[in-house]
A protein has these predicted regions:
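Structural signal for hydrophobic packing residues in well-ordered secondary-structure cores
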Residues: 3, 18, 43-47, 142, ...
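Short glycine-rich phosphate-binding loop at a beta-alpha junction
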Residues: 22-28
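Acidic, Ser/Thr-rich low-complexity intrinsically disordered segments
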Residues: 205-225
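Internal, active-site/partner-interface "lid" segment
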Residues: 154-158, 176, 188-211
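Glycine-rich phosphate-binding loops that contact phosphosugars or nucleotide phosphates
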Residues: 29-182
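A short, well-structured juxtamembrane/interface segment
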Residues: 2-20
Length: 225
């Protein structure tokens, strides 16, 4: 059950943002950007999801360079200014460590602009000194931040004889959390008489046609559709 996640997007937020035509914007650096892809344009997923993709902060151009850039002060402003935000949008900002410059600064910029900000991070890193000029953790700049329970270093298994832990968990737990948040949002809106548009599989009868209508409606607001 996603019941324990219900307070994350309370009814007022759903009514004020989704029911007023807002988009849910999702941002993360490195592997955290995977959660933006997880929620975007997929069967069973919400239509009004607008991912924030900045390719140098992803992995396919240079994975090692993306790690360097995530710590660069001021880059968040460059990314933020590339985007067009609506007053009814909501930002979900993902960073397991929650200490690096770009995600923390980006969340702060969104908050300062009046957007409600939901974070997904690991509380295990709260004891670590922030690596940004703000001196803040992601938890400090979000309206609410959900613990993804990733251990320090992300890897969760330490087989006997191995020097280094293996099996990172933040993507798995993060995907569960973000889908839980969205499920609660849809459920609350439905209870209030508003049906959030949802994609269906393009491999079922009529699915492709239905999805095409959704993309036609949202294409101007979500360019990467």
């Amino acid at each position: 059950s996603f019941g324990s996640l219900a307070p994350i997007i309370p009814y007022r937020s759903c009514k004020h943002y989704l029911m007023r035509g807002g988009l849910i914007r999702v941002f993360g650096c490195g592997h955290s950007h995977i959660l933006a892809e997880e929620t975007f344009y997929r069967a069973g997923g919400l239509v009004p999801i607008s991912p924030i993709f900045y390719e140098p902060l992803m992995l396919h151009e240079s994975a090692s360079e993306s790690s360097v850039l995530e710590k660069r002060e001021g880059l968040a402003l460059t990314v933020f200014q590339r985007e067009s935000f609506n007053k009814n949008d909501v930002l979900i900002c993902v960073s397991t460590s929650g200490v690096n410059a770009v995600p923390v600064e980006f969340a702060k910029l969104a908050s300062d602009a009046g957007l409600p900000v939901i974070g997904i991070s690991s509380d295990e890193y709260l004891s670590q000194t922030p690596k940004n000029v703000l001196g803040l953790h992601l938890q400090d700049v979000c309206d609410v931040c959900v613990d993804n329970f990733a251990p320090h270093g992300d890897a969760c298994l330490k087989p006997e004889g191995l020097e280094t832990s293996i099996s990172p968990v933040s993507t798995v737990t993060g995907a569960f959390i973000i889908n839980g948040i969205l499920a609660e949002a849809v459920g609350i809106c439905h209870e209030r008489g508003y049906e959030v548009p949802v994609y269906v599989s393009g491999n079922i009868p009529g699915g492709a046609e239905k999805n095409k209508r959704h993309t036609a409606e949202y294409k101007l607001r979500i360019p990467c559709l």
